């Protein structure tokens, strides 16, 4: 009766092994099944090709140098290398285990040290577990998906670091362009100051005009110091990204390129998310955990292994080589007797899988929001640039009128300088918007992942 119950238990568990844990078949979770096992070999080339829309060779060169020298990327590549080695190691588990040994033993007397006996022995042992239920294959697939997830993590790191490097590059370019405007205004104020001082000595201008022009010069110099400090901070951050290599001053002296609209693909449907490395990594991690769940279940099933032993033992070396013995042994193990010990492990595996499902859904939802937010940001900045551009035209005309009125003595120097200051503030505001526009476009382009357009 006990034997019948045992056999029945085996069949019940074998049947359960083919019932995989249920999964929510929502639209978002179904994306995880579409993730590719083929990871792009040269993601840096795809990223650099996407940067061509900015028509900035210095930017492309900088990003390429960051890819070559950044320590975080080097560390990520080492993690990927480690994952590949672990996967190759796990594949070997599907092969038979082979071991061999050679022994020589001698027995001698303690006092007389004469030889009592000598024994030679050798053996070869081959052990192979037959993967009846696919447990070893599931473990191998789990390790493969972990390797794929690590590869996608590496690509995601490349996108993040590329965006960060571009951000610092444009910050430095923006500051250089703004400094150029301040230096131009400083030259104008210096010329105005010389004129005011000569007219003050001649009694034409009052001391108030002298104080006004000196105060304006001090404000400009203060703004220059502030921008130079910001530039130094951005330079230091960029130097860290480059790992202090290829410190070309060309990057630090670049100016913001002239504004031009960027033509990009604005498609942000859910299918495009499959090109995002962070989404692909989350999907691969989920699939890895799924295979882990299956393999944990299958640990409860019987295992069947074959063992082949070839050995020989004799006092003569020639006998060891000429008269070996072989043994063939089969073994069936019933690990399901440890059900109560394994039960918690199964529950933990299920809970982890549910956690990874939630992580995947959250990443997909966040990615959708990012694409929409970046697209909205681009549209808002574009409209703002048009508005500021119109304002600049009006202020330039106003400044020309006020200059004529100041020279005619109709308005004070303070009023004229205020109009001039307003124009240059708006000009720097325009440059800031252009910088924000380029960076918003870059974020949108990289948020679309590594799709090749």
Give the location of each predicted region.
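Acidic, low-complexity, intrinsically disordered peripheral segments
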Residues: 246-248, 260, 429-453
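Small/polar (Gly/Ser/Thr/Ala-rich) solvent-exposed segments
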Residues: 74, 94-117, 127-156, 160, ...
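C-terminal motif of bacterial Sec signal peptides marking the signal peptidase cleavage site
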Residues: 13-15
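Periplasmic alpha-helical coiled-coil/stalk elements that build and connect Gram-negative outer-membrane
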Residues: 17, 136, 145, 151-268, ...
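Sec-dependent signal peptide recognition
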Residues: 2-9
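Bacterial Sec-pathway N-terminal export signals of envelope proteins
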Residues: 17-88, 253, 257-287, 364
